[in-house]
Curated annotation (Swiss-Prot):
Disulfide bonds: none annotated. Keywords: Growth regulation, SH2 domain, Signal transduction inhibitor, Ubl conjugation pathway. This is Suppressor of cytokine signaling 5. Residues 1-50 are annotated as: Required for interaction with IL4R. One of its GO terms (cellular component) is cytosol. It comes from Homo sapiens (Human).
Length: 536
């Protein structure tokens, strides 16, 4: 214990020597043992070399009084080593940023009890500087006090600690619990505040009727969110027809690529639903159909069997080759269309069927022959009539991209391709709309060609083929030739039209044989009647 007491007294004396009293002669020299930490220039430097004016400064007296340290006589500091100076050097490097922005003239604040009674609390950096040692410690205390006062001034809006006491007593009582809680939490967890002006926006809610979205003019108040997005609403709800000027007046600079694709798909959908303009001097054929509306049926663009064809004033004759009940639900059964149907007063004979709804639709269309039937017949990848199972048997074990062209088993389509991709045999129908062939007639962004052979040539290039599209790089050649009758039909169809076949001096059976490879293009759809059927 005696040894510990001597060490403590020695340590206390060293700390007190840093704060010399006025008129005291402090001629403490650094011992030679401190050469391990100090440079050669710092060996002969004496801490007591400062002038009496510097020692008698009121700032130094104030520091000594606040720290509770009494002036002491000169005593040499011996047996110093590097270990005792490490905390001082680290402390200087940490608080260097705060010392750069400190200005003198600010009243010092008391240090807390922990740092005041700690053994290292009063130790100064006597070995790290020479002339600026005392000013460094004073500036450090100035920075701590000034930064604390600035934080209080920013928070309470006062300029001194004395004003802060009066302001705090006046404002704490008037501040609400939420404000005091927010001040306590601070900026770490900011609480969201809602202005009173935003409350009426949520209170004025009302239901929007579907009929309001179908109006030509905006029914919503100007400046509202719906009024600003009215052009987007009309883009998806307004019927687009060749006579519609909505998209013609729309600013194309405001439309992005995705919006442009959506706009094209919408126009294609309505074009499939309404039909296209017929070519001049084209013979118009008419379908009249009456069927039951079933909303579960998927509406498609093709004309299925089960419809009644009339020419001129002849009566309607139902077709007998109706495969199933679903074939009678054709494109004319598009009950989801929301625009008003044009009611015609003309009387048409039709076959009525019982059901929940009775729909009478008149569809005008034209017949067109396949334009490149001769090239298709001469193509070695074309196998003629073949179902999917025969095609899969031929493609089994073939490399990626092997394909063949065959007749489609569905009556609504002419041709299909069977190909190998992803180690399996896949099939894709060739669709047609507005005299263009593609693998998806509903999407105008998909590649399309005016001929079937042109479509096949495009997908032979792997760089032009998407991962979900057919890859047709290697053709699987057929092993048999077509008959002379097939080749003659292809040659005749290249030189005439569908309606021109009727003028050829041929028997009706041969005329039907020549018309086999043709497609129907819809040119106009008219909804004549739509009314509920009374249950018996």
């Amino acid at each position: 214990m005696d040894k510990v007491g001597k060490m403590w007294n020695n340590f206390k004396y060293r700390c007190q020597n840093l704060f010399g009293h006025e008129g005291g002669s402090r001629s403490e020299n650094v011992d030679m043992n401190s050469n391990r930490c100090l440079s050669v220039k710092e060996k002969n430097i004496s801490i007591g070399d400062s002038t009496p004016q510097q020692q008698s400064s009121p700032l130094r007296e104030n520091i000594a009084l606040q720290l509770g340290l009494s002036p002491s006589k000169n005593s040499s500091r011996r047996n110093q080593n590097c270990a005792t100076e490490i905390p001082q050097i680290v402390e200087i490097s940490i608080e260097k940023d705060n010392d750069s922005c400190v200005t003198p003239g600010t009243r010092l604040a008391r240090r807390d009890s922990y740092s005041r009674h700690a053994p290292w609390g009063g130790k100064k950096k006597h070995s790290c500087s020479t002339k600026t040692q005392s000013s460094l410690d004073a500036d450090k205390k100035f920075g701590r006090t000034r930064s604390g006062l600035q934080r209080r001034e920013r928070r309470y809006g006062v300029s001194s600690v004395h004003d802060m006491d009066s302001v705090s007593s006046r404002t704490v009582g008037s501040r609400s619990l939420r404000q005091r809680l927010q001040d306590t939490v601070g900026l770490c967890f900011p609480m969201r505040t809602y202005s009173k002006q935003s409350k009426p926006l949520f209170s004025n809610k009302r239901k929007i009727h579907l009929s309001e979205l179908m109006l030509e003019k905006c029914p919503f108040p100007a400046g509202s969110d719906l009024a600003q997005k009215w052009h987007l609403i009309k883009q998806h709800t307004a019927p687009v027809s060749p006579h519609s000027t909505f998209f013609d007046t729309f600013d194309p600079s405001l439309v992005s690529t995705e919006d442009e694709e959506d706009r094209l798909r919408e126009r294609r959908r309505l074009s499939i639903e309404e039909g296209v303009d017929p070519p001049p001097n084209a013979q118009i054929h008419t379908f009249e159909a009456t069927a039951q509306v079933n909303p579960l049926y998927k509406l498609g663009p093709k004309l299925a069997p089960g419809m009644t064809e009339i020419s001129g004033d002849s009566s309607a004759i139902p077709q007998a080759n109706c495969d199933s009940e679903e074939d009678t639900t054709t494109l004319c059964l598009q009950s989801r269309r929301q625009k008003q149907r044009q009611i015609s007063g003309d009387s048409h004979t039709h076959v009525s069927r019982q059901g929940a709804w009775k729909v009478h639709t008149q569809i005008d269309y034209i017949h067109c022959l396949v334009p490149d039937l001769l090239q298709i017949t001469g193509n070695p990848c074309y196998w003629g009539v073949m179902d999917r199972y025969e095609a899969e048997a031929l493609l089994e074990g073939k490399p990626e991209g092997t394909f063949l062209l065959r007749d489609s088993a569905q009556e609504d389509y002419l041709f299909s391709v069977s190909f190998r991709r992803y180690n399996r045999s896949l099939h894709a129908r060739i669709e047609q709309w507005n005299h263009n062939f593609s693998f998806d007639a509903h999407d105008p962004c998909v590649f399309h060609s005016s001929t079937v052979t042109g479509l096949l040539e495009h997908y032979k290039d792997p760089s032009s083929c998407m991962f979900f599209e057919p890859l047709l790089t290697i053709s699987l050649n057929r092993t048999f030739p077509f008959s002379l009758q097939y080749i003659c039909r292809a040659v005749i169809c290249r030189c005439t039209t569908y309606d021109g076949i009727d003028g050829l001096p041929l028997p009706s059976m041969l005329q039907d044989f020549l018309k086999e490879y043709h497609y129907k293009q819809k040119v106009r759809v008219r909804w004549l009647e739509r009314e509920p059927v009374k249950a018996k």
